[in-house]
Amino acid sequence: MPHMLYTEIPTHRPVTPLLDEIDHPQQLRQLEQSQLTQVADELRQFILYAAGQSGGHFGANLGVIELTVALHYCFNTPHDRLIWDVGHQAYPHKVLTGRREQLMTIRAQHGLAAFPAREESVFDTFGVGHSSTAISAGLGMSLARRYQQNPCEVVCIVGDGAMTAGMAFEAMNDAVAHDADLMVVLNDNDMSISCSTGGFARHLAAIWEKGQLVNIDEHGEAYVQPHPKWTYNSRLHQSATDAADNLFKAIGFDYFGPFDGHDVEHLVHVFNALKKRQGPRLIHIYTKKGKGFEPAEADPITYHAITKITPVSIAPVKKSPPKYSDVFGQWLCDEAAQDDRLLAITPAMCEGSGMVKFAKQYPERFFDVAIAEQHAVTLAAGMACEGLKPVVAIYSTFLQRGYDQLIHDVALQNLDVTFGIDRAGLVGEDGPTHAGAYDYAYMRTIPNLVIMAPKDENECRQMLHTAYDFNGPAAVRYPRGAGLGVEIQQELTKLEIGKAEMVLQCHPEHDEHITILAFGSRVSVAMEAAQQLAQLHDIGITVVNMRFVKPLDEQIIRDLAERTQLFVTIEEHAVMAGAGSAVNEYLAKAQIMKPTLNLGLPDTFMAQATHTQMLKNCGLDAEGIQASIEKVWLRIVQAV
């Protein structure tokens, strides 16, 4: 049966008679194999509809429909373990494992998680969100079950983009050392979020160019045949051994494929046959991201994720302020035009980090190193050693993966590397796996490193210039999404290192005084809360935009301390070990004995919701800030 090709996202729930009867994979396994193509088509229609209702990851899910059906049909889940690397592609898995009716809540507050989550379902065997962890986790499960003498099949589904990370190969190397019973399904769609880059992508292309398929018979025996996608040519006279040679075999895995990842019945044959073999096995399949939805097949990058469909409004659309990532991208181009020493590095996040324009304008100065955060940081260090000025664009949550390199390879040598740290703070619907909640804590203990946090998009631009001009490692940490709508100054101006600015004084003549030290994205809401407090309680309040987490402006704290009855620190970061902790440390060192209230993210992983909901939930919106300060202030007043 040919695959259906859809051109529009349905706004009405599709008719899915087979899918409606599947609330557990056991019900799927009771169907005839000949019915699986219809199940896959119904599942694709339902994913299209559900994504239109809720938004979320899109193209990757459409690309693994047939694979997901085949896996749950062949393997005894949840006894057998399926581990989805990253988890962008797990929506069909969630539908087939009893969460069909909840799928429209995905990524919403109190809804399904954006990625597989152990607390959500017994079928979600490992919590994911970051790349390239599945093989390590799967190997751990396989070895544990061997030790417990309770074996099961463990299948890790990994994309070609995730396979570029060193962690994946570390795990494969170890799997061979232990001769582990482990299956790795390489889902090759020539895409991560951006296009796959580097030698590994070329290696996969070379496997294709051989024109050979390593197939498997019903007894689990491998044999080589001409690939059905290729016409006969002289290359097919290579020996079977030479034809099958590739990196995976060199490591020690049995290699099979490449197979059509959209041929569900052949995938069932392959998986059933592979269950008759033991040891490390890699199954190479090729899929198309966005399969079955014509616009996504044509433009998989744009359709990596979508927003939910909303009713058309006749009201004019208000233009949003630029995103911080776009402000970064424009600064990068402007700075590069003035200094040919600037080189830019990204670990596979060109689009998300706002670097598309730079990559087109300066291709020889742009380096997409694939999903390799450790390498990205040390690559920058090497460039800096040769007198160049590299800029690393990286999400806060992913810089965690390059922490040793940040310390050992950059800061210890005091190298001139600039870090543009995107997605700092809470990130809304992607939930705790992608939150940038810990960067102050893991960076501010590092000697030589300057850390800045802008209050708005214009200050972000000027801080990036300041960091770039600084002779040493410097980081600018900015949030996801749009700025505040302030005017962006085109001229690049350096800020004084370690110097804060006073942005608001309410009733400065009053003796009773609160000083708010705000960092980054919380400056504007701190000002809003301060004005409300000053009006309600007739007290003096000063709000300071601290700008620098390190070095801290100790002078302004010291100057304000004499007339301050309460210090308040506010940050969109974990309150433990964050910027507020840096203020506490200084106050203790200077023996300034003043009550201090630290506001930030609580010591818990914040559940997914919209960014606005998350801020409200942890008391970091203007109303929550006002209430927290008011409670402590009234206690101080009553004690006097």
Swiss-Prot record:
Superkingdom classification of source: Bacteria
Essential cofactor(s): Mg(2+); thiamine diphosphate
PROSITE patterns listed in its UniProt record: TRANSKETOLASE_2
Binding-site positions, Mg(2+): 160, 189
InterPro entries linked to this entry: Dxylulose-5-P_synthase, THDP-binding, Transketo_C/PFOR_II, Transketolase-like_Pyr-bd, Transketolase_BS, Transketolase_C
Record keywords, A-Z: Isoprene biosynthesis, Magnesium, Metal-binding, Thiamine biosynthesis, Thiamine pyrophosphate, Transferase
EC number: 2.2.1.7
CDD domains, per the entry: TPP_DXS, TPP_PYR_DXS_TK_like
Coiled coil feature spans: none
Gene3D superfamilies named among the record's database cross-references: 3.40.50.920, 3.40.50.970
Catalytic EC class: transferase
Catalytic activity: D-glyceraldehyde 3-phosphate + pyruvate + H(+) = 1-deoxy-D-xylulose 5-phosphate + CO2
Binding residues for thiamine diphosphate: 88, 129-131, 161-162, 189, 293, 373
GO MF entries: 1-deoxy-D-xylulose-5-phosphate synthase activity; magnesium ion binding; thiamine pyrophosphate binding
Any one biological process term the GO annotation gives: terpenoid biosynthetic process
Free-text remark on how the cofactor is bound: Binds 1 Mg(2+) ion per subunit.
GO cellular component: cytosol
Family per similarity comment: Belongs to the transketolase family. DXPS subfamily.
Function: Catalyzes the acyloin condensation reaction between C atoms 2 and 3 of pyruvate and glyceraldehyde 3-phosphate to yield 1-deoxy-D-xylulose-5-phosphate (DXP).
Subunit (UniProt): Homodimer.
Protein name per its UniProtKB record: 1-deoxy-D-xylulose-5-phosphate synthase
